[in-house]
UniProtKB/Swiss-Prot annotation:
Its EC number is 3.1.2.6. It comes from Synechococcus sp. (strain JA-2-3B'a(2-13)). It is an enzyme of class 3 (hydrolase). This is Hydroxyacylglutathione hydrolase. Keywords: Hydrolase, Metal-binding, Zinc. Zn(2+) 2 binds at residues 58-59, 132, 170. Binds 2 Zn(2+) ions per subunit. Zn(2+) 1 binds at residues 54, 56, 113, 132.
């Protein structure tokens, strides 16, 4: 299974999963259809599945147009998002699996950004498609969920193997790390990562994927139990530390 990263809109990433052996493909969070259709034509591949992480338009906006071209493609999403994902045919629950290219992805229920957010974790290849729950250096805003839910979701993700590749849905990394430095500025891993990311963005290069290990070391929203973040917020309870950090980032 090859993962192809397709930039879209201002800062979205769409992920096309390609199986060259069968000339089939699946797409994760198609914000728009055009780049997906172009890449499918280039590859000579048929779209067989659409994996949506949540219902926001910049993650499902291409569903209908893709289904017009590939009407047999199955559309996966959370059962909580029933009626909110265009063309949805499969309603998923936590712990279920989906298959592509002979590999199984476990469905992780990770609410907080939205109440029905899910992630797809391919353990064999070590690939996590986490939508807007976990970002490189940050996390999603709480539009529908609670801090308690988001901490539970992020804790679930930070326990995945350190080498797991984090394919998040937006190129927000540089700004996320600028904020991180305001609350964890003495962290040498964070300082080094910021320099690397700044250099990548100067050339227009993507900073995604990261890894779970990198996020654990440098992402303040996975470090609520670290003394530096507790000191920055003046709090110790994990949920309260997270909520304070999220509020600070919202105003950054």
């Amino acid at each position: 299974m090859r993962v192809l990263q397709l930039p879209a809109l201002r800062d979205n990433y769409i992920y096309l999963l390609h199986n060259p052996d069968t000339a089939t493909a699946a797409v994760v969070d198609p914000a728009v259809a055009e780049p997906v259709l172009e890449k499918l034509a280039e590859l000579g591949a048929e779209l067989v599945a659409i994996f949506n992480t949540h219902h926001h338009h910049d993650h499902v906006g291409g569903n209908r147009q893709l289904l017009e071209r590939y009407p047999r493609a199955r559309v996966y999403g959370s059962q909580v998002d029933r009626g909110r994902i265009p063309g949805q045919t499969v309603e998923l629950k936590a712990g279920e699996t989906v298959e592509f290219a002979g590999r199984l992805a476990k469905v992780l229920f990770v609410p907080g950004h939205t109440r029905g957010h899910i992630a797809y974790y391919f353990s064999e290849s070590g690939d996590l498609f986490c939508g807007d729950t976990l970002f490189a250096g940050g996390c999603g805003r709480l539009f529908e969920g609670t801090p308690e839910q988001m901490v539970g979701s992020l804790d679930q993700l930070r326990q995945l193997p350190e080498a797991t590749r984090v394919w998040c849905a937006h190129e927000y990394t540089l700004n996320n790390l600028r904020f991180a430095l305001t609350v964890d500025g003495d962290n040498p891993d964070l300082q080094a990562r910021y320099q690397q990311v700044a250099a990548l963005r100067q050339t227009g290069s993507p900073t995604v994927p990261s890894t779970i290990g990198e996020e654990r070391r440098t992402n303040p929203f996975l470090r609520w139990d670290q003394p530096a973040l507790q000191a920055a917020t003046g709090l110790q309870d994990p949920v309260r530390v997270f909520a304070r950090l999220r509020g600070m980032k919202d105003q950054f």
